[in-house]
Amino acid sequence: MHPGIGFAILVTAGAWIAACDGSLREKIGQSDIDASVLMTIQPPKCDPSATAADSGACTGGGQPGSDCLMCHHQGGPASPYTFAGTLYDAAGAKPVAGATIYVEDSAGNLATAITRPNGNFFTADGFVQYPAKAFVSLCPDVLEMIGAVDQMTGANCNTSGCHTAGFRIHLP
């Protein structure tokens, strides 16, 4: 086979045989034509304002917008959360209460949380597979997170490399 040619054609007893060099990408999300499984997850309906069971205040000293999973992780000093963060208005200044946060993985496992009066949201509901897709819903808006929640960044929404002081989780 000539270097740089992706396949070879062999002649054997008058029959043509093609051989592949293995460069095809047929794994989910890796093909030029296949879509990611996450693209099949539909946005939730528009949710009316909900009321959380508590204020969302952290008794350990955490503040809205700070790193929730610094303490709230397996083996940490506080009860572990699956995901946590703070929701703000579009300007990133005022906390938004009563919104529903959805995180759904590619296997269909769904975890939800309601934003507290201080904008904090958190849950211990389990989803077990990464990547996952996140939405925030509060009528009339339903917003989808642009990127996937992945194992590398985890579901520590306030510090996963995106949602820090300059780019808060927001609605709308």
Give residue spans per PLM region.
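Sec-dependent bacterial lipoprotein signal peptides
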Residues: 1-18
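Sequence context surrounding c-type heme c attachment/ligation sites in exported
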Residues: 19-98, 103-172
